[in-house]
Amino acid sequence: NYYSKREKKLKPILYFAANEKTLIVADSISKYYAININDGKLNWIKNNIAPFNSQVKVFKDKFFVVDFENILRCFSIKDGKEIWNFKTEKSFIKSQQKLSLIINNDRVIFVNTLGDVSSIDIKTGNLIWQTPTQSSDIYENYFSLKNSDLILENNTIYFSNNQNQFFAIDKRNGVIKWIQNLNSNLRPTFADSLVFTITLEGYLVAIDSRNGNIVRMTNIINKIKNYKKENIKPIGFIISQDKIYLSLSNGRLIIIETLTGKPLEIKKIDNEKISRPYVLNNNMYIIKDNAILKLN
């Protein structure tokens, strides 16, 4: 165990990434460390000057993570030493949202708590381009801004937020291709030239990836009895060949027909919030409080 009693009381949030030999952990109390996957032994452990609040990404002999100061940091997997860092503008408050990173070829691309998307040279840490997505005049938006994960398809970055904005950004130069008015901080999914998302109001939306036009919008949450009264919110979704699996804040999982957007089944997983579904080796998993469930 790598935490003292005092640290355990802080209930740190852990962020993971791994390669074939090493598990990398960064947490919300500024610690980061590496564990040998084969024997579980600690390779090294270090402390950052600020807590971490992003995904961790591994690329060759390096890993990348963003801290609460909106600084992207590149570390060595071998010994944990910092190789370079890239600073972006700090926010007035420390957002609790987990920030998203993607790695593509020679670039690491991330969005900070202010909604600025930055593309960084993976070797040098130099800025390639930066695209702000929020007006600097509307400071109150920063306090409540929650972005979805970034996804990358066909040289285009897609993501959305809870400020009624869905973006398509050119990976090569940071130019915004289009913006659609959709309210969602759920990770979108790309399939057959369409981008799928589910809004916080419960609408399944299919978007033409080329121009941002909405192809279809279907209300799926209203199929649940008393969904408005109970303030049920979508948590996350995945798409299979013919079905969409959507987890909800009330512990339910909705199975939706992809072609029509029609809900097929509602499964009770728990009475509390559950995670977005995950797929590993053709099996689906959902995380709930203190447990990981494998679904048939």
Where are these regions (language model features)?
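Extracytoplasmic beta-rich repeat domains
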Residues: 1-17, 41-60, 82-105, 127-154, ...
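Structural signature of WD-repeat beta-propellers
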Residues: 27-28, 67-68, 105, 112-113, ...
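Short loop/turn segments that connect beta-strands within beta-propeller blades
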Residues: 36-40, 76-80, 121-125, 170-173, ...
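C-terminal closing repeat unit and adjoining cap/tail of repeat-based domains
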Residues: 173, 243, 248-296
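Loop/turn-rich, solvent-exposed surfaces of beta-rich toroidal or solenoidal domains
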Residues: 190-207, 213, 217-256
